Amino acid sequence: MVKLRLKRCGRKQRAVYRIVAIDVRSRREGKDLRKVGFYDPIKNQTYLNVPAILYFLEKGAQPTGTVQDILKKAEVFKELRPNQPKFN
């Protein structure tokens, strides 16, 4: 099973995160399938590769809670096809 989750980067006390598609059994810092975005909580910046995110969501990838909140704020779920499952 594939999940969309955050992968920590940056230095001590200054974390930035990559949003990645990764196998559930992998570690947080493990090998990812594809990088699909970037999130900086300190500057409150996000970059999302929306076509790649939609591809993984259509294939059944499950976003984690934090990634789901980021995607909701960016209104990515509105771009899913109507027959795809909705995420709360």
Swiss-Prot record:
One of its GO terms (cellular component) is small ribosomal subunit. The keyword Ribosomal protein applies. PROSITE patterns: RIBOSOMAL_S16 (PS00732). Keywords: Chloroplast, Plastid, Ribonucleoprotein, Ribosomal protein. InterPro entries: Ribosomal_bS16, Ribosomal_bS16_CS, Ribosomal_bS16_dom_sf. GO terms for biological process: mitochondrial translation. It is found in: Plastid, Chloroplast. GO terms for molecular function: structural constituent of ribosome. The keyword RNA-binding does not apply. Belongs to the bacterial ribosomal protein bS16 family. PANTHER family: 30S RIBOSOMAL PROTEIN S16, SMALL RIBOSOMAL SUBUNIT PROTEIN BS16M. This is Small ribosomal subunit protein bS16c. The lineage of its organism: Eukaryota, Viridiplantae, Streptophyta, Embryophyta, Tracheophyta.
